[in-house]
């Protein structure tokens, strides 16, 4: 079983510095009081109230560029962390039966509540060595073919599919292209539109381009409050349009990457609330919110027959965009 990430917030982000200074001060006062056996409850209460107020104000209306930082926080719970917190009887399955086992995409069998399911998702690393092994959460073709093998298994045995999305994008190396990266993603899309079992997708961190969409064709798309989902990362968009990374903020605003924007556009069906400061501050609470939403939507989908679920999924995506000849 994979060790869960720490609930400690970790290094502060740019916009969190004032809050981190207050929280560090609180820790110092508590330590001093404990070591010297003195009562500092009044001072603590004042600073805690100030920190709580600052936290509310800070996270109430974050701009897209700051939400992007939260979504990329290395302390944020990963797919394997959520599987541990959400599921019982987890059995990981490996390999695509064609080339190899891609550690950037994990999946297997588990029990969610009373429901046996196939659950999968992108997996980033926790440190440099782990990130190299998992390719920073960017799957190769064999990762998507492993996902397809698991989804075919789920459809054959009438098991719901749960997909957790957290990737900067599919691996863009020459080796991946030589092994058919585009074909692997396209085939996943084709098959996911054909399945009759319920498919629930949730963006838990980054949702980057086709690398996210390759396991993102669901009857329901859920998204954490401080996650992002986009056709391209703001970094890459800035480089392509302006030839440098100085315009990330402008790109992030234009791309509509936040859960709030995507809910308004009809891409996301439900925004899952996060603990104040992000899911990494209280992974158990974040997982409880995710589990409640998944079970509620799953119960709704299980009341429908297979052809209805398939048609609903197709119509959901057909309604997302239209083109006009000019």
Curated annotation (Swiss-Prot):
Alphabetically ordered keywords of this record: ATP-binding, Cytoplasm, Fatty acid biosynthesis, Fatty acid metabolism, Lipid biosynthesis, Lipid metabolism, Nucleotide-binding, Transferase
Extent of the signal sequence: none
Domain of life of the native organism: Bacteria
Species of origin: Gloeobacter violaceus (strain ATCC 29082 / PCC 7421)
Gene3D superfamilies per UniProt: 2-enoyl-CoA Hydratase, Chain A, domain 1 (3.90.226.10)
Subcellular location: Cytoplasm
Family: Belongs to the AccA family.
Alphabetized Pfam families for the sequence: ACCA
Family annotation (PROSITE patterns): COA_CT_CTER
Record-annotated CoA carboxyltransferase C-terminal domain positions: 46-300
Family matches, as PANTHER family: ACETYL-COENZYME A CARBOXYLASE CARBOXYL TRANSFERASE SUBUNIT ALPHA, ACETYL-COENZYME A CARBOXYLASE CARBOXYL TRANSFERASE SUBUNIT ALPHA, CHLOROPLASTIC
Pathway: Lipid metabolism; malonyl-CoA biosynthesis; malonyl-CoA from acetyl-CoA: step 1/1
GO CC, alphabetical: acetyl-CoA carboxylase complex
HAMAP family listed in its UniProt record: AcetylCoA_CT_alpha
Gene Ontology molecular function terms on file: acetyl-CoA carboxylase activity; ATP binding; carboxyl- or carbamoyltransferase activity
Subunit field text: Acetyl-CoA carboxylase is a heterohexamer composed of biotin carboxyl carrier protein (AccB), biotin carboxylase (AccC) and two subunits each of ACCase subunit alpha (AccA) and ACCase subunit beta (AccD).
Reactions that this protein is recorded to catalyse: N(6)-carboxybiotinyl-L-lysyl-[protein] + acetyl-CoA = N(6)-biotinyl-L-lysyl-[protein] + malonyl-CoA
GO biological process: fatty acid biosynthetic process; malonyl-CoA biosynthetic process
Function: Component of the acetyl coenzyme A carboxylase (ACC) complex. First, biotin carboxylase catalyzes the carboxylation of biotin on its carrier protein (BCCP) and then the CO(2) group is transferred by the carboxyltransferase to acetyl-CoA to form malonyl-CoA.
Name listed for the protein in its UniProt record: Acetyl-coenzyme A carboxylase carboxyl transferase subunit alpha
EC code: 2.1.3.15
Enzyme class name: transferase
């Amino acid at each position: 079983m994979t060790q869960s990430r720490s609930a400690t917030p970790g290094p502060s982000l740019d916009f969190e510095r004032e809050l981190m200074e207050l929280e560090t001060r609180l820790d110092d006062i508590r330590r001093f009081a404990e070591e010297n056996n003195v009562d500092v409850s009044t001072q603590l209460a004042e600073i805690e109230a100030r920190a709580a107020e600052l936290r509310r104000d800070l996270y109430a209306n974050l701009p897209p560029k700051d939400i992007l930082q939260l979504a990329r926080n290395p302390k944020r719970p990963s797919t394997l962390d959520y599987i541990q917190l959400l599921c019982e009887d987890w059995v990981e399955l490996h390999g695509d039966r064609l080339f190899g086992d891609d550690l950037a995409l994990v999946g297997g069998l588990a029990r969610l509540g009373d429901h046996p399911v196939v659950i999968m998702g992108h997996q980033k690393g926790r440190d440099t060595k782990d990130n190299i092994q998992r390719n920073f959460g960017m799957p190769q073709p064999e990762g998507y073919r492993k996902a397809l093998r698991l989804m075919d298994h789920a459809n054959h045995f009438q098991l719901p599919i749960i997909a957790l999305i957290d990737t900067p994008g599919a691996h863009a190396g020459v080796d991946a292209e030589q092994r058919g990266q585009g074909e692997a993603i396209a085939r996943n899309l084709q098959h996911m539109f054909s399945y009759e079992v319920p498919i629930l997708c949730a963006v838990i961190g980054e949702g980057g381009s086709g690398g996210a969409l390759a396991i993102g064709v669901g009857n329901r798309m859920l998204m954490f409050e401080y996650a992002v989902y986009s056709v391209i990362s703001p970094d890459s968009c800035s480089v392509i349009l302006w030839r440098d990374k100085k315009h990330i903020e402008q790109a992030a605003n234009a791309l509509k990457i936040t859960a709030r924007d995507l809910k308004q556009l009809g891409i996301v069906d439900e925004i899952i609330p996060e603990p104040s400061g992000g899911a990494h501050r209280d992974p158990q609470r974040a997982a409880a919110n995710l589990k409640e939403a998944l079970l509620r939507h799953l119960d709704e989908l299980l009341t429908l027959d297979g052809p209805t679920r398939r048609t609903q999924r197709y119509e959901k995506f057909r309604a997302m965009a239209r083109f006009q000849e000019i």
